[in-house]
């Protein structure tokens, strides 16, 4: 038990940041049977498959070593009878166990200290929540002049992923295992967009692929770690957890030689130093906002492109980074079009017999609904054509009318809920019109009738009941407070659950 505590008590030492070698040792049995550890969030994770237990992984790896079937290559895996007969089962079990183990150092930040100690949560400086983006767009974006719109590229070779994990994982066998999986089933497009995955392996092993993608993105974000001491607005993950300290300092030395071939890092820090900067990211899209000038942002662009090409040994296309001036361009992020406009304000000032008119321009952030991409998504889901004209959608004959209307209404309510942070919500009326008429045409098609005849027989109130937004429901529930609620709904409202409902593709498959 003392040996386990040496691994788990990260508050004492940060030298054991990665626990993957435990999967090849007998400590794994203690992990599985320890009551304190079994009550942790690792064992209670609903996304973990019970069939892929750590004991099964341990026994499987031991069996592979004993039978000497682990020393194989992707070229002869098809001829190997051990691997060929149980290829799908073994790959899923091992990949789940691998992903489970490598998540331990990150999950242990929330686990209480073991055996008799006063329960306390180990504190770590971590990335801010994704929901901190919403107040940033509303409160802070208007204070910046330029933003770098960055699209994080895919790694061009699987060896880049292995090299990234090499500084975390100290066990050579685990790296060979990962390299074998990636060469056997590699499909990076399916890693990024699992819904379009063509590989059955990537569909069954989302946990492993999600970890690999997060580690890849985390390596790209490591470039901003050194700015943490320069700006209190920039939060980054604690470097002791993510990087080997020697490797981290070696990375900083490369920053010096990007522009000037000198050894003094502080003398060249002015190239990228800014008292107030913000960095936010959602999925592959990241933004670096600054109050600096266009020259300053071009320096940052050159710095990012050069460093990423040097560090990852790949060609980083400069067109993946756009320099946008907020006063002239809109920023597309999180399904919104954000822009900064000047709101003129005239103030009359009078001193004795003299009066003056003072013109003040106040910056205001507009978050708009991208109506054209939204209509394109509806057209792709067969709710309308490319011009936005509603069309009937083929449905199963066993679906009832109320079920069909409820599904259309759920899509509209989710879209209305997601875009509640928009400063101008009139664009949603177009979406409501498309879904409402598409629902009517779908029902008319089912009953082999026309839309006019169908609505005349059942009444238009039927659709209004199911295509009712949250605003309408609230007004009907509290009619006396309708005037106050109207003022509230004219403003932006950011709901904390919109991250899980922002994809229209989740609903089109239900028809």
From Swiss-Prot:
A GO term for molecular function: RNA binding
Write out the annotated subcellular location. Plastid, Chloroplast
Q: Which UniProt keywords are given for this protein, alphabetically ordered?
A: Chloroplast, mRNA processing, Plastid, RNA-binding, tRNA processing
What's the domain of life for this entry? Eukaryota
InterPro entries with a match to the protein in the record: Domain_X (IPR024937), Maturase_MatK (IPR002866), Maturase_MatK_N (IPR024942)
One GO term under biological process is:
RNA splicing
Q: What's this protein's family per the entry?
A: Belongs to the intron maturase 2 family. MatK subfamily.
- Function noted in UniProt: Usually encoded in the trnK tRNA gene intron. Probably assists in splicing its own and other chloroplast group II introns.
Q: What is this protein called?
A: Maturase K
Q: Quick one: which gene encodes this? A: matK
């Amino acid at each position: 038990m003392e040996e386990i505590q040496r691994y788990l008590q990260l508050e004492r030492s940060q030298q054991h940041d990665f626990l993957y070698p435990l999967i090849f040792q007998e400590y794994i049995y203690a992990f599985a049977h320890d009551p304190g550890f079994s009550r942790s969030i690792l064992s209670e994770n609903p996304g973990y498959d019970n069939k892929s237990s750590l004991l099964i992984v341990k026994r499987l790896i031991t069996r592979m070593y004993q039978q000497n079937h682990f020393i194989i290559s992707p070229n002869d895996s098809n001829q190997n009878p051990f691997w060929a007969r149980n290829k799908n089962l073994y790959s899923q079990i091992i990949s789940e166990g691998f992903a489970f183990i490598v998540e331990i150092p990150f999950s242990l930040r929330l686990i209480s200290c073991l055996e008799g100690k006063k329960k306390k949560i180990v504190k770590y400086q971590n990335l801010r929540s994704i929901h901190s983006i919403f107040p940033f767009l509303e409160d802070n974006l208007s204070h910046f002049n330029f933003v770098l719109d960055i699209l994080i590229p895919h790694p061009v070779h699987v060896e880049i992923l292995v090299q990234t994990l090499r500084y975390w994982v100290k066990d050579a066998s685990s790296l060979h295992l990962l390299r074998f999986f990636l060469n056997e089933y590699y499909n990076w497009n399916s890693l990024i967009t699992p819904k379009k995955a063509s590989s059955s392996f990537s569909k069954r092993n989302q946990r492993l692929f999600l970890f690999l993608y997060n580690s890849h993105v985390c390596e790209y974000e490591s470039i901003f770690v050194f700015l943490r001491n320069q700006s209190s607005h920039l939060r980054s993950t604690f470097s002791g957890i993510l990087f080997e300290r020697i490797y981290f300092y070696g990375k900083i030395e490369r920053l010096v030689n990007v522009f000037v071939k000198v050894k003094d890092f502080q003398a060249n820090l002015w190239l990228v130093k800014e008292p107030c900067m913000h960095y936010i990211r959602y999925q592959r899209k990241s933004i670096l906002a600054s109050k600096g000038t266009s020259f300053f942002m071009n320096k940052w662009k050159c710095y990012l492109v050069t460093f990423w090409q040097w560090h990852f040994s790949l060609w980083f296309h400069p067109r993946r980074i756009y320099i946008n001036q907020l006063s002239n361009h809109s920023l597309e992020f999180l399904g919104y079009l954000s822009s900064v406009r000047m709101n003129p304000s005239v103030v009359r000032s009078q001193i004795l017999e003299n009066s003056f008119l003072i013109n003040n321009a106040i910056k205001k952030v507009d978050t708009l609904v991208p109506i054209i991409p939204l209509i394109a998504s509806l057209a792709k889901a067969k709710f309308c054509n490319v011009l936005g004209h509603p069309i009937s959608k083929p449905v199963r004959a066993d679906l009832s009318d109320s079920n069909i209307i409820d599904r259309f209404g759920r899509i509209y309510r989710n879209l209305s809920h997601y875009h509640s942070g928009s400063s101008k919500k009139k664009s949603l009326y177009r979406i409501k019109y498309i879904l409402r008429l598409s629902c009517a045409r779908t029902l008319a098609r089912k009953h082999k009738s026309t839309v006019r005849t169908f609505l005349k027989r059942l009444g238009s109130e039927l659709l209004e009941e199911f295509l009712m937004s949250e605003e309408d429901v609230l007004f009907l529930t509290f009619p006396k407070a309708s005037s106050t609620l109207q003022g509230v709904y004219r403003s932006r409202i950011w709901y904390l659950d919109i991250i899980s409902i922002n994809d229209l593709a989740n609903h089109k498959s239900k028809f």
